[in-house]
Amino acid sequence: MIRFLGAAFAAALLLPVASAETVQLAAADGVKVFGEVWRASGAKPPIILAFHQAGSSSAEYAPIAPRLAQAGFTVLAIDQRSGNGAFDGTNRTAAELGRKATYEQALPDLEAALAWAKANSHGAPVVVWGSSYSAALVFLLAARHPGDVNGVVAFSPGEYLANKTAVRDAARKVDVPVYIDQASGADEVGQSAAILEAVKSTDKQQLLSPSNSTHGSSTLRADTNPAGAEAHWTAVLKFLKRFMPS
């Protein structure tokens, strides 16, 4: 599959990857949001904003973001206020906040990341990428900021919010390319399909997962999905190539 990625995209795979740098953002309600940035080489690389699943942090993307950066994308992965220490990480935002937060209450953190992307993209495309509950929130984010989001990647989205139609309602306003992946269980596949059907854009796709898959973005991690991660990588990189400069 890699032979179809195109010359510019394939060349980006050979570029060196910088180490992650820590950033601090300010949400609209004053909450301090911590994150890590992996910067791609080259002029005006597209940006991926990577959001984690429940009980997690930016550490979910520690083995994922460097590969995306090597493929030519600058990646910002944040610690949302709704999260914890999965994947051997520490959620600095939640720790400093000092109280539990609902999934919906994390939306300002995603908006802070989007504001960072607007200030740093220099006109390059911005892709919002969610995992589990944040895969639900990225549809709300894209619906609220239609001029600022160029693509949506959602791993294991579902109607996880208090309003059980909120994600589909938002998806009906999303008119940018959308990619959905999920674990192979019937419930996850069904929830993903319902959300994808609601998406306004006609440029949308769902990976009907192979048997080797795990929940959320962790399906790309070799430590959690050793037998299946590469199949998911092939599919998502093929989708992402449209955002690379020609």
Write out the residue ranges for each language-model feature.
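Primarily recognizes the serine-hydrolase "nucleophile elbow" in alpha/beta-hydrolase
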Residues: 113-173
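Positively charged n-region of N-terminal signal peptides that target proteins for export
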Residues: 1-4
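C-terminal catalytic histidine-bearing segment of alpha/beta-hydrolase fold enzymes
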Residues: 204-246
